[in-house]
From Swiss-Prot:
GO cellular component: centrosome; chromosome; Cul4A-RING E3 ubiquitin ligase complex; Cul4B-RING E3 ubiquitin ligase complex; cytoplasm; nucleus
Main function: Substrate-specific adapter of a DCX (DDB1-CUL4-X-box) E3 ubiquitin-protein ligase complex required for cell cycle control, DNA damage response and translesion DNA synthesis. The DCX(DTL) complex, also named CRL4(CDT2) complex, mediates the polyubiquitination and subsequent degradation of CDT1, CDKN1A/p21(CIP1), KMT5A and SDE2. CDT1 degradation in response to DNA damage is necessary to ensure proper cell cycle regulation of DNA replication. CDKN1A/p21(CIP1) degradation during S phase or following UV irradiation is essential to control replication licensing.
Lineage: Eukaryota, Metazoa, Chordata, Craniata, Vertebrata
Subcellular compartments: Nucleus; Cytoplasm, Cytoskeleton, Microtubule organizing center, Centrosome; Chromosome
Family: Belongs to the WD repeat cdt2 family.
Protein name: Denticleless protein homolog B
Region (Disordered): 473-524, 601-698
A Gene Ontology molecular function term of the record: protein-macromolecule adaptor activity
InterPro entries attached to this UniProt entry: G-protein_beta_WD-40_rep, WD-repeat_CDT2_adapter, WD40/YVTN_repeat-like_dom_sf, WD40_repeat_CS, WD40_repeat_dom_sf, WD40_rpt
Chain's gene name: dtl-b
Length: 711
C-alpha cells in the first residue's frame, strides 16, 4: 500500500498523537495547496511571459520529481520539484523548436523525451546533454500529440492536423538525415465516418511553392498507446474514438482506413464535437476521453460495449488544449478546465461533486499527476504560469495569517440544485402545486376563437375547479331555453386543443337562439349542428329554393325555374339533375314528353299552393297519388331509393298515357311541332291520374325518348 505509507508520514497524514490516518483517501483531496514558491512563470526567448502548452513528469527511476514543461515559443525547461533553492530550480533549458510545442512525452525509463511542434516535425532529445538525437519528418501540418508505448522504448506515435497518424521507430536508419514513418494511417478522423473502404483515392499533384492545405474536418487531436500493437486516437469534429491495430500496414492500401473498434459519440449534441485528451488508467482497462461538450466519458477499452461506463461533469472544455491525467492508483481523475480551475473526480463515484483547484486566472490547459508521488500535481495555465500542488494536511491547524502565502487551494465544488436536476433528470410534465390556492389558466374571454390566433391569457382559477372528473357533463338547459351552468373543467394537463375552441354564434336571426356562453369552452365541439326532433318544418315556399344568377333577361325561362336549381336541403344536395340539356334537345320531337310539363307537375306536387292545401284540409278523402308523384318521391329521395325504382319507367308510363289520349295527338301536329311557342307553355298543365300497365311488353326502349324519329 504505497499511498497509505505516503499519507501516514508525519508531515502529511499522521495526527498529533502519531496515530495513522484511517479516513478514506478522497478526504485528503481538499488538502492540496500551492504556495508562492511553487508558482513558476513561463518565459520566452526574449524574456517575456508566454503560456505553457505541455507538461509531463519523468518516468526515469529516481528522477520522477523532474517536470518537463514546453511553452509557446518552443522552449523546454526541466524543473526539480524537490529542490528548495530557487537558483537551482531549473535543471535544464533548451530551445527545442522555433515554433510552439503542443505536446511532450518521456521515453519510458530513459533520460530522453520527444517534442511535437507546430513546425510539422517531432524531435528526440537527450535531456542530460541537451542534444538533439533525431528529427522526424512526414507530417504536412502541425503536430498535436505524441505518445510512447510502455512496452517499447523505440516506438512512438504522433497525430497532426493533416489527419494522419504516423508511427516512428528510432531503430531504423535515417533517410536524408531524418527519421521516416514506418506506418501511417491517412484520414483517420474524417468528418464523414465510413465503415467500409471506398474506392481507390487519386493522389493530387503537389504544387511547389504552396503550403499544403489544412483540412480542419480531419484533424487528429490526441493519440495514445494501449499496448504494444494498439493505438487509440480521437479527432476534432467527428466525435469518435477509434482503436487501431498496428500489425496492419495501413499505408499499403490507398483506401479509407477501418479501425478494429470505435466508440461513437455518446452525447446528444448536434454540433460538431471532438476530444481534446485521452488517458488510460494503470490497468489499461478504463479509457477517459475529454470531450468538448464539457463531459469526460469513461469507456471500457477491453470490453465489447461501446457505451460509456461513467460520465464526469462539472468542468468546462471549450478548447483542444485541455488535457487530463489519472492518479497513480487509478482512483482519481484530474482535468483542466476553461473556467480557470482544475478538477479532481473520484472514479468510483462520478456523480459526487468534484474537487476544485482554485488559483489560476486563465484557462487551465495541461495537467500532470506524478506517477510515483500521489501528493504532487502540476498544472499549466494561459496566465503564463506553472504551478505545483502539494498535499499538506498541516494547513488544517495553521492560522489565517499563514494562509496568505498560498496562491492556490482546493475546495469542493457546489452543484446548484437546478443544474443537477437538469443533468440527472429528464424534463417531465408540469405537475399541479398543491400548496398554491390559485393556478394560472385561460380566461373565459380568450377561450373563444379569434381571427388573430393569439394564445389564451393567464388568469387566476381556484384549484377546486381543476379537480379531475370522471367524464364531461353536458350542460343543462334552464326553463327559458338558455344555457345553464358550465361543465366542470378538466385538469390543465389533460386539456386538448379542441377544448379551447368554442362554437361561434349562428347567423340565424331566430328569437329562440342565444349566443353560447364563453364558459362553454371546455365542452366538446361538434362539427355539424344537431337538428332537434321538435323543430317546426316550414313550408317549401319559405325555404331557400334559390336560383342561379344568369345573364339572360328572360324571366320566363322554364329551365331556370324548374330544372337547373336544387333546393338547399341536406337530403337533396346529392340528387341534382340537369334537365336543361334534355329539354332543349328532346322537346323538338313530336313523340317526346315535354320536360317542362313534367317539371311543372313535380314542382306543383312538391310545393302545393295555399288554395290547394286549404282544399285538401277541407275534404276528408285524401287525393289519389299519380305515378308522377311516385316518381317525384323517388327523385327527391334518390340517394336512399332502392335499385328497383326507375324514373325512366315512370316517364314511359306517362308517355303511353298521353299518346293514347286525343289531346296529345292534336298537339303533336307539324305546325305545332315547328312553332317555338311550345318551349314556353303555360305552367298549369292538367294533372290527372294515369293507369300504369305492368306488362313488360307495353314498355318502349329508352332510345325512343331521346332521339328524333326519321320521317
Amino acid at each position: 500500500m504505497l499511498f497509505r505509507s505516503v499519507v501516514n508520514k508525519p508531515r502529511f497524514g499522521c495526527g498529533h498523537n502519531g496515530a495513522p490516518f484511517t479516513s478514506p483517501l478522497q478526504s485528503l483531496l481538499q488538502c492540496y495547496q500551492c504556495v508562492k514558491q511553487d508558482e513558476h512563470i513561463s518565459y520566452g526567448d526574449l524574456g517575456r511571459a508566454v503560456p505553457p502548452f505541455g507538461c509531463a513528469f519523468s518516468t526515469v527511476p529516481g528522477m520522477s520529481h523532474v517536470l518537463a514543461v514546453a511553452n509557446e515559443e518552443g522552449i523546454v525547461r526541466l524543473y526539480d520539484t524537490e529542490c528548495g533553492d530557487m537558483q537551482r530550480l531549473v535543471v535544464k533549458e533548451f530551445m527545442a523548436h522555433t515554433n510552439a510545442v503542443f505536446d511532450i512525452a518521456w521515453v519510458p525509463g530513459e533520460h530522453k523525451l520527444v517534442t511535437a511542434s507546430g513546425d510539422q516535425t517531432a524531435k528526440l532529445w537527450d535531456v542530460k546533454a541537451g542534444e538533439l538525437i533525431g528529427e522526424c519528418k512526414g507530417h504536412q501540418c502541425s503536430l498535436k500529440s505524441v505518445a510512447f508505448s510502455k512496452f517499447e522504448r523505440a516506438v512512438f506515435s504522433t497525430g497532426g492536423r493533416d489527419g494522419n497518424i504516423m508511427v516512428w521507430d528510432t531503430r531504423c536508419n535515417k533517410k536524408d538525415g531524418f527519421y521516416r514513418q514506418v506506418n501511417q494511417i491517412t484520414g483517420a478522423h474524417n468528418a464523414i465516418d465510413k465503415q467500409t473502404p471506398s474506392k481507390v483515392k487519386k493522389r493530387k499533384p503537389s504544387i511547389r511553392g504552396l503550403a499544403p492545405s489544412v483540412d480542419s474536418q480531419q484533424s487528429v487531436t490526441v493519440v495514445i498507446f494501449q499496448d504494444e500493437y494498439t493505438v487509440i486516437s480521437a479527432g476534432a469534429v467527428d466525435g469518435v474514438v477509434k482503436i487501431w491495430d498496428l500489425r496492419k500496414n495501413y499505408s499499403t492500401y490507398r483506401q479509407d482506413p477501418v479501425p478494429v473498434k470505435l466508440f461513437p459519440y455518446p452525447g446528444n449534441s448536434t454540433r460538431k464535437l471532438g476530444y481534446s485528451s485521452l488517458v488510460l488508467d494503470p490497468t489499461g482497462t478504463n479509457l477517459f476521453a475529454s470531450c468538448t461538450d464539457d463531459n469526460v466519458y469513461m469507456f471500457n477499452a477491453t470490453g465489447l460495449k461501446t457505451d460509456p461506463v461513467s460520465v464526469f461533469r462539472g468542468h468546462q472544455n471549450s478548447t483542444f488544449y485541455i488535457k487530463a491525467s489519472v492518479s497513480p492508483d487509478g482512483q482519481f481523475l484530474l482535468s483542466g478546465s476553461s473556467d480557470h480551475s482544475a478538477y479532481i473526480w473520484q472514479v468510483s463515484d462520478p456523480l459526487a461533486a468534484p474537487i476544485n483547484l482554485i488559483g489560476h486566472c486563465q484557462e487551465v490547459t495541461s495537467v500532470a499527476w506524478c506517477q510515483s508521488d500521489f501528493t504532487k500535481i502540476a498544472t499549466c495555465s494561459d496566465d503564463n504560469t506553472v504551478r505545483i500542488w502539494r498535499l499538506n494536511r498541516s494547513s488544517e491547524d495553521s492560522s489565517e495569517s499563514n494562509k496568505t502565502d498560498y496562491v492556490g487551494w482546493a475546495c469542493k465544488k457546489k452543484f446548484e440544485p437546478s443544474s443537477m436536476a437538469a443533468i440527472l433528470c429528464t424534463p417531465g410534465k408540469p405537475s399541479m402545486i398543491p400548496s398554491s390556492s390559485l393556478m394560472s389558466s385561460p380566461t373565459p374571454a380568450t377561450c373563444a376563437p379569434s381571427n388573430t390566433g393569439d394564445l389564451p391569457l393567464p388568469s387566476s382559477t381556484p384549484l377546486s375547479a381543476l379537480l379531475p372528473t370522471s367524464k364531461l357533463q353536458t350542460p343543462k338547459r334552464i326553463n327559458n331555453g338558455g344555457l345553464g351552468a358550465s361543465p366542470k373543467q378538466m385538469s390543465s394537463s389533460k386539456i386538448s386543443i379542441k377544448d379551447w375552441v368554442t362554437r361561434t354564434p349562428k347567423s340565424s336571426k331566430g328569437t329562440d337562439s342565444k349566443t353560447p356562453s364563453p364558459r362553454k369552452a371546455f365542452t366538446p365541439v361538434e362539427q355539424y349542428p344537431i337538428v332537434s326532433n321538435a323543430r317546426v318544418q316550414l313550408p317549401y315556399e319559405k325555404r331557400a329554393k334559390r336560383r342561379l344568377e344568369t345573364s339572360s333577361e328572360d324571366v320566363e325561362h322554364v329551365c331556370l325555374d324548374n330544372c337547373c336549381v336544387m333546393e338547399l336541403e341536406p337530403r337533396l344536395k346529392k340528387s341534382k339533375l340537369d334537365l336543361c340539356s334534355l329539354n332543349e334537345r328532346d322537346c323538338r320531337d313530336d313523340k317526346c314528353l315535354r320536360l317542362s310539363d313534367l317539371s311543372k307537375e313535380f314542382d306543383q306536387e312538391l310545393s302545393p299552393s295555399p288554395s290547394t292545401s286549404l282544399h285538401m284540409n277541407a275534404t276528408d278523402n285524401p287525393p289519389t297519388l299519380s305515378p308522377l308523384s311516385e316518381m317525384k318521391s323517388d327523385f327527391v329521395d334518390k340517394e336512399n331509393s332502392s335499385p328497383e325504382k326507375n324514373w325512366l319507367s315512370a316517364l314511359g308510363h306517362k308517355f303511353k298515357s298521353d299518346n293514347s289520349s286525343p289531346q296529345f295527338k292534336s298537339s303533336s301536329s307539324p305546325s305545332s311541332r315547328n312553332s317555338t311557342s311550345k318551349k314556353h307553355q303555360p305552367r298549369n298543365a292538367p294533372n290527372s291520374p294515369v293507369s300504369v300497365p305492368t306488362t313488360p311488353g307495353s314498355m318502349r326502349k329508352i332510345c325512343t325518348y331521346f332521339f328524333k324519329k326519321s320521317e
